[in-house]
Amino acid sequence: MASLSFDGLTAQYDQTRTFDPFCFRQAMDWLTERFPPSQFPNVLEPGVGTGRIALPLVERGYQVTGLDISEEMLNLCAAQSRALEADSMLCCLRADAVRLPLRSMSFDLCVAVHLFYFISDWQAAVREMLRVLNPFGTLILLHTGFGAEVPHLNERYQEIAKELGYAFPDYGVRSTSEVVEYTASLGYAAERVDQPEWEWMTKINLQDALNHLRDRAYSFTKDVPDAVHWAVIDGLQHENLKEAASPAAEIEVPNHISIILIRQ
């Protein structure tokens, strides 16, 4: 099974992958202090998407190469880069992370944001990222929170779909710990970093959350057949709206940013 493309999800991507600006800025401050661009200038981001991580890195002085298999995502990333007059510091290439068209030992940092959940041969992607890092380079696994997602609604969507006979494709890892264990088997060490100032609570409107699922804003809904999808949405609407005080009810979702550093 191939890596999952986010073509078709571009319109709602940034809207549904939000994070607290203050917490994100704090995390980027930590990253910049730990890996100053004067010493670690060349950054690779496979799965660059719309550039929501790459562009802040460029603004901090890094030279970023962003890869994605989604042409729609790359077009939006390039447009946003031009709008910020940052295109000289961000190179966008269409490529699959399992076959990087890049020289070995050519990057100081490689940033992967939730990426390995969407690559069937994720071990090959890990090996490729380690290959293009220089001997003192670091693979950075960055978790930016749930965005506009309500985890229990997503889980219930998948439960109902399975009850209706749909089998979800198993694209990649189920947990980042699989990546950590795999890199350990290759002789790499991992360091997890969590900070209290990287935690926040997101208030999400119930109807908005249901609408995002209805509109297939998340990758796991992308290939669900229409008949199953709409039956699931009807079930979710019935289960949740009848129990809520109003469709405008808000759900509080704990969120956090975490960083895992993998290096020799």
Task: Label the model's feature ranges.
Residues 1-41, 52-56, 73-76, 80-85, 138-170:
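Conserved class I S-adenosyl-L-methionine
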Residues 171-187:
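Short alpha-helix
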Residues 98-110:
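A short acidic, Gly/Pro-enriched loop at the edge of an enzyme's catalytic core
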Residues 42-46, 50-99:
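Class I SAM-dependent methyltransferase SAM/SAH-binding core
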Residues 123-135:
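A short glycine-rich, Lys/Arg-flanked "PGG" loop and its adjoining helix->strand segment in the class I
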Residues 108-121:
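A short SAM/SAH-binding and catalytic strip from SAM-dependent methyltransferases
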Residues 50, 190-264:
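Conserved Class I S-adenosyl-L-methionine
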